[in-house]
């Protein structure tokens, strides 16, 4: 229709015909409300960067863009926000970084799960630092597990392993840094001056569980490779700290709610910069295409419960009185000969404060005892 109108105008007066279009108002101008909202968010960012003991060191303009939509109910293009930041002094020039040359490349979901923790002051209004524990599928970039805890223990990481196994299945391999919770390193973790045990001769609690489940374990052997694990944390860390600061979060429970919201955004709405896909839809597509190495969790024989797998492990020798001693606690033992070793599978309950101690002799389940978590000394388990 428009073409017909133009053709008619041309035929009526070809000498004076023009197609010039006059704009009635500029298109690159944003309204005053949006302008003020951008500056407000930029000022909050600057105050956050200036705080001491704070992991945030630069501006996140993409985060501000999201805040404009969610909190101010307006929109602005990312280049516009950056332009205003430069004009008003809210800009820090990025440093040149050395390219990471040891990428772990995977082709299947579940081929490799990156697992680690990050210790930071997640809210400037809290007087404590907390640990963020996450597990992320390398191929899909989907966050399989995420939680904030006040203390980093082997048990906290075992809970993460259990959640991933029961919800998503058993992965082909796990990728860790060389923290003592994940790996025994001779010289660093040995108490003996004559080092009869060399690196990897002693399996930490986490590795014992993965070995029982037939899951391979890989380690980051360089600072560059460790950066591969830490990069997913930077995105979460960046947004969690900023949101906690804006919402005045003081308690870990409130911070966990912020974490859930950001993880939900990351998993189900955020298009990943590397894959170009939303992690959830990429994970689902890989499964639909038969490109998943996740196996269904099946309880290994002869165990009776998932508690026998996802537990802290120890062993004790039955004394002539058919008792064992554990952290100054004494338990009667039935079903195991004296001078024989009994396997302990310990499952703490953080809500009740009590731990269930499941006793095994070889392939036989011989009973359950209970003890207070504090008497077990969870921090001693590596």
Residue spans for each PLM region:
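Double-stranded DNA-binding cores of transcription factors and transposases
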Residues: 1-11
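DNA-binding alpha-helical recognition surfaces that contact promoter or target DNA
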Residues: 5, 66, 83
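Short, basic alpha-helical nucleic acid-contact segments in DNA-binding proteins
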Residues: 9-17, 74-75, 83-96
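Short Lys/Arg-enriched helix C-cap and helix-to-coil transition segments
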Residues: 14-29, 92-105
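A short, amphipathic alpha-helix used for macromolecular contacts
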Residues: 24-77, 118-124
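Well-ordered mid-protein domain cores that form the structural environment of catalytic cofactors
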Residues: 98-115, 134-136
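RNase H-like DDE/DDD metal-dependent nuclease/strand-transfer catalytic core used by mobile genetic elements
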Residues: 112-132, 138-254, 371-374, 378-382
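C-terminal, beta-rich DNA-binding module of retroviral/retroelements integrases
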Residues: 263, 267-382
């Amino acid at each position: 229709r428009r073409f017909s109108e133009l053709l008619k105008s041309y035929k009526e007066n070809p000498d004076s015909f023009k197609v010039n279009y006059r704009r009635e108002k500029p298109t690159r101008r944003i309204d005053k409300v949006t302008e003020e909202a951008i500056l407000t968010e930029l000022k909050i960012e600057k105050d956050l960067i200036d705080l001491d003991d704070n992991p945030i060191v630069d501006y996140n303009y993409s985060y501000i863009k999201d805040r404009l939509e969610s909190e101010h109910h307006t929109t602005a293009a990312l280049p516009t926000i950056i332009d205003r930041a430069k004009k008003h002094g809210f800009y820090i020039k990025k440093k040149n970084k050395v390219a990471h040359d040891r990428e772990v490349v995977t082709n299947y979901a579940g081929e490799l799960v990156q697992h680690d923790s990050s210790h930071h002051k997640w809210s400037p209004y809290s007087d404590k630092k907390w640990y963020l524990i996450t597990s992320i599928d390398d191929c899909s970039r989907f966050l399989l597990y995420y939680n904030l805890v006040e203390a980093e223990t082997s048990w906290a990481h075992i809970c993460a392993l259990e959640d991933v196994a029961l919800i998503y299945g058993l992965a082909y391999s796990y990728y860790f840094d060389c923290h003592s919770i994940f790996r025994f390193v001779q010289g660093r973790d040995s108490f003996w001056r004559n080092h009869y045990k060399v690196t990897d001769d002693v399996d930490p609690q986490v590795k014992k569980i993965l070995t029982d489940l037939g899951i391979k374990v890989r380690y980051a052997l360089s600072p560059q490779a460790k950066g591969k694990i830490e990069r997913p944390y930077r995105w979460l860390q960046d947004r969690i700290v900023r949101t906690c600061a804006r919402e005045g979060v003081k308690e870990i429970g409130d911070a966990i709610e912020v974490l859930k919201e950001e993880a939900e955004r990351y998993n189900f709405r955020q298009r990943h910069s590397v894959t170009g896909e939303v992690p959830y839809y990429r994970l689902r597509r890989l499964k639909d295409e038969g490109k998943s190495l996740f196996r269904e969790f099946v309880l290994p024989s002869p165990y009776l419960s998932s508690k026998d797998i996802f537990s802290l492990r120890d062993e004790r020798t039955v004394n002539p009185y058919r008792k064992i001693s554990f952290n100054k606690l004494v338990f009667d033992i039935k079903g195991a000969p004296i001078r024989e070793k009994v396997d302990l599978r310990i499952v703490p309950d953080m809500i009740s404060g009590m731990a269930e101690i499941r006793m095994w002799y070889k392939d036989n389940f011989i009973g359950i005892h209970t003890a207070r978590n504090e008497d077990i000394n969870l921090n001693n388990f590596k």
